[in-house]
């Protein structure tokens, strides 16, 4: 992790020396990235940045990581993702090859992110790709890898013999491991080729990246090819620098569901399937039970469906930097991004949807186009007068996005040869008005004026102030389309004081204090104006006419969610760099949470109104420490630990105008036996993420639940009414703290890297046990082997007990995992001509 005071933190709005930064910023360089098979940039820094939670929610090779910085900051009305900038251009983690990344900087607190306005309210991730710099011999770099994966721990389901013993009347004669039938040993490979070079005036870099990834489940394949070229030219004695970049990417994935990649329902069917069911009948057809609801052959779901999704992205970007006079830098950034997606999916006449539901050949097609334009103009003036050093920056930003989408589905095809998604119009359902066709267009824009000033005295006392004035089209029609977002931070380099000159412990010690305000715009447009939509049909003058009804009420007072954050931090370097790190404490108050309030009709046209009302608080501590315990000529050991603690509380659900009828709302779903029920409660005075369900404390002599009701009294199964008022908070799904531990050991030419991380202080809902340990669950034929375990160590669960979500299925979710172990060997390659890179590494 970078801690050098001389390194730069690159921002779209200018640059700052690391030593002058007064905000909470984490930097991870390429040498410290997570090595091995990674899907996107998020996995490169997993466990490397305190306070940054990075998760991979599933094994789908097309899926991306999910990132949350410093807890939860909204209850659903605003955007939650951090702003991602790739070489200063807004983008997504999946649009840059991990092998092409040089460094990642994370701006964590409000004083650092305020200048980025509304899109920086959840933090900013700055991705810097590999660059060609200075006079350099033409170089070619290749790196690649081949990887495989496996299911670390399968659900321990009954096999065929065990199933026959327990349920002899349901023996269908076969012996099928359904998980094995739908899974495989996948092989993935990634190849990255870079060419770079230049002279004192012109530099270039070209990069090609190809990735072929297989998922563990059959028919979950992903293929990606991308390339970029970037040319930088300097002229007029280096006063003018021109940079032009071109990026293109094409993704293709196999699809087993409409609009997506792998259908998770297939795995669910494999786990519930009777292990004595054959895959196929004696006549070669798929073994299906069309009379049983939601009981489907998972192999048929895979092989009686066909589809693919193709995505392309083309990006042009340019940058002009001009220094007309000493200390003055003028910059202009332009980019144009065009995303296209085309998808198609179809099911055959042998698919369960045709056999059971009468949807012969159900198929769908869809496409979208997204165009994003960015222009940003900045002017920065830097001046140093004696012990005083200051800089002033001002700028203007314009961002415009146009999104267009269309989709069609149809069924009622006569055969599998002339219909389907390749010829979707000939199905009968669309002609009969039973299928769907639609389109939409969503234009948005974001305009910002911003400024920043920094001051340093004797490199000892540091001050930064920033201001952004921003308008968003999502708030069009309200009185608050524009917002003002200020920030200020100060720093004190204590080691520059005279009283620290004779101490031998700290090489650098800096105290930071910052405060910043950022805003979150609504996820959806036009929430502040009255909207209409189509409703039901009415019979008027002998004709059925579709009515138009209210869809929302106007609210001219709707505005941004405002996050006000205070950060106090300490950076330190000791004993010649053998010990370094940072400690941060932050407090975030989010005011004006966007929430849907119930309102009377009349006078309102609609019974709900989107408005600002609630308040939420996040507090936390983040610690990063790097130690080099051993360092000599032949052996070096460097170890880095990260720790972050976060507490969250909903302070209020009501505002000065709109009041919530209750101090809570229920949300979330948990599926048991095909039913969906609210599983979470968000309540004033409590943390976000609480599980809400019935609390069981014991079982009776027959294996039936004994509950604790609303009054704390014990109630047996037959007398318990399952009233919502008898539910309790039975856990919380958000970790209270995270930790990471990264080790690098070098012995002569060998090096060993070990990356570990964990999350603690949270619970999970074990849906597998909830569904597969209940004998009465009629929609699931197979069971876990633990179905015969003693509940609370007393009795097996009674067959009288209906499947339900309760506290028995809430478990401790703490984990500690080894992400990566990499062993490397460095060796010298001799070239016939001099090369600045004569050391290569084998892994």
Give each language-model segment a name:
Residues 1-6, 10, 831-842:
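Single conserved hydrophobic/aromatic residue that forms the stacking wall/gate
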Residues 1-249, 257, 315-316, 434, ...:
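Short, small/polar-rich motifs associated with maturation and membrane association
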Residues 19, 134-175, 216-217, 226-313, ...:
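Surface-exposed loop/interface segments of Gram-negative outer-membrane beta-barrel transport/assembly proteins
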Residues 53-56, 495-502, 829:
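Active-site phosphate-binding and catalytic loops of NTP-dependent enzymes
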Residues 129, 193-197, 229-233, 316-322, ...:
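Residues on the lipid-exposed face of transmembrane beta-strands in outer-membrane beta-barrel proteins
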Residues 222-234, 481-491, 833, 837:
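Short secondary-structure subsegments characteristic of cysteine-rich extracellular domains
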Residues 227, 449-453, 461-469, 483-492, ...:
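Extended, hydrophobic alpha-helical segments in both membrane/secreted and soluble proteins
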Residues 733-764:
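Glycine-rich, aromatic-lined ligand/substrate-binding cores of catalytic
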């Amino acid at each position: 992790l970078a801690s050098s005071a001389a390194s730069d933190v690159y921002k779209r709005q200018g640059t700052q020396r690391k030593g002058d930064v007064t905000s909470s910023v984490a930097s991870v360089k390429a040498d410290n990235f997570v090595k091995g098979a990674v899907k996107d940039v998020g996995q490169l820094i997993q466990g490397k940045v305190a306070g940054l939670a990075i998760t991979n929610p599933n094994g789908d090779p097309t899926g991306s990581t999910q990132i949350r910085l410093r807890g939860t900051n909204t209850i659903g009305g605003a955007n939650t993702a951090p702003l991602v900038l790739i070489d200063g251009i807004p983008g997504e983690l999946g649009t840059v090859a991990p092998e092409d990344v040089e460094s990642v900087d994370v701006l964590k607190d409000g004083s650092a992110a305020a200048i980025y306005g509304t899109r920086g309210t959840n933090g900013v991730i700055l991705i810097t790709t590999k660059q060609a710099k200075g006079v350099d011999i033409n170089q070619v770099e290749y790196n690649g890898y081949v990887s495989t994966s496996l299911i670390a721990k399968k659900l321990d389901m009954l096999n065929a013999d065990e199933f026959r013993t327990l349920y002899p009347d349901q023996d269908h004669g076969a012996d099928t491991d359904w998980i094995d039938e739908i899974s495989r040993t996948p092989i993935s490979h990634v190849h990255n080729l870079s060419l770079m070079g230049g002279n004192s005036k012109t530099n270039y870099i070209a990069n090609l990246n190809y990735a072929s990834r297989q998922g563990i489940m059959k028919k979950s394949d992903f293929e990606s090819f991308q390339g970029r070229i970037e040319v930088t030219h300097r002229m007029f004695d280096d006063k003018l620098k021109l940079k032009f970049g071109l990026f293109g990417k094409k993704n293709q994935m196999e699809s087993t569901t409409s609009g997506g990649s792998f259908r998770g329902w297939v795995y669910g069917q494999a786990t519930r399937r009777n292990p004595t069911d054959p895959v196929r009948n004696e006549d070669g057809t798929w073994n299906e039970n069309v009379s049983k609801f939601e009981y489907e052959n998972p192999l048929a779901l895979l092989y009686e469906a066909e589809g693919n999704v193709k995505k392309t992205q083309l990006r042009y970007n340019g940058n002009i930097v001009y220094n007309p006079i000493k200390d003055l830098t003028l910059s202009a950034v332009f980019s144009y991004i065009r995303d296209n997606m085309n998808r198609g999916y179809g099911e055959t006449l042998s698919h369960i949807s045709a056999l059971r539901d009468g949807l012969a050949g159900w198929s769908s097609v869809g496409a979208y186009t997204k165009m994003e334009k960015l222009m940003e103009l900045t002017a920065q003036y830097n001046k140093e007068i004696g012990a005083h050093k200051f800089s002033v920056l001002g700028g203007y930003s314009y961002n415009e996005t146009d999104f267009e989408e269309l989709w069609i589905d149809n069924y009622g095809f006569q055969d599998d040869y002339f219909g389907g998604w390749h010829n979707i119009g000939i199905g009968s359902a669309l002609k009969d008005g039973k299928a769907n066709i639609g389109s939409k267009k969503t234009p948005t824009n974001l305009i910002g004026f911003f400024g920043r000033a920094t001051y340093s005295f004797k490199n000892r006392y540091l001050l930064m102030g920033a201001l952004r004035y921003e308008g968003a089209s999502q708030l069009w029609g309200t009185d608050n389309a524009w917002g003002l977002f200020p920030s200020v931070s100060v720093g004190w380099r204590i080691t520059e004081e005279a009283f620290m000159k004779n101490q031998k412990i700290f090489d650098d010690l800096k105290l930071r204090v910052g405060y910043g305000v950022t805003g979150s715009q609504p996820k959806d447009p036009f929430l502040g104006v009255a909207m209409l939509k189509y409703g039901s049909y009415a019979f008027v003058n002998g004709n059925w006419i579709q009515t138009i009804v209210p869809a929302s009420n106007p609210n001219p007072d709707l505005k941004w969610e405002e996050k006000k954050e205070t950060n106090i931090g300490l950076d330190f370097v000791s004993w010649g760099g053998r010990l370094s790190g940072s400690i941060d404490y932050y407090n975030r108050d989010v005011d004006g949470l966007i929430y849907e309030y119930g309102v009377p009709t009349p006078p309102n046209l609609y019974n709900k109104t989107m408005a600002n009302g609630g308040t939420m608080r996040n507090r936390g501590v983040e610690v990063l420490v790097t130690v080099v315990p051993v360092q000599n000529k032949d052996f070096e050991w460097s170890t880095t630990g990260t720790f972050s603690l976060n507490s969250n509380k909903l302070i209020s659900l009501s505002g000065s105008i709109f009041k919530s009828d209750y101090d809570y709302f229920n949300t979330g779903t948990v599926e048991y036996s095909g039913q969906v029920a609210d599983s979470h409660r968000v309540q004033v005075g409590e943390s976000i993420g609480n599980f809400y369900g019935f609390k069981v404390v014991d079982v009776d002599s027959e294996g039936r639940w004994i509950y604790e009701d609303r009054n704390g009294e014990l109630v047996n199964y037959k007398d318990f009414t399952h009233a919502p008022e008898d539910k309790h908070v039975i856990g919380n799904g958000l970790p209270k703290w995270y930790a990471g531990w990264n080790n690098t050991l070098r012995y002569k030419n060998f090096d060993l890297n070990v990356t570990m991380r964990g999350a603690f202080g949270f619970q999970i809902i074990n849906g597998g046990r909830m569904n597969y340990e209940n004998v009465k669950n009629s929609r699931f034929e197979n069971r876990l082997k633990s179905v015969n375990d003693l509940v609370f160590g007393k009795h097996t669960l009674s067959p009288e007990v209906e499947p339900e979500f309760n506290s028995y299925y809430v478990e401790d979710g703490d984990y500690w995992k080894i992400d990566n172990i990499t062993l490397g060997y460095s060796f010298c390659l001799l070239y016939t001509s001099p090369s600045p890179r004569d050391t290569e590494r084998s892994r």
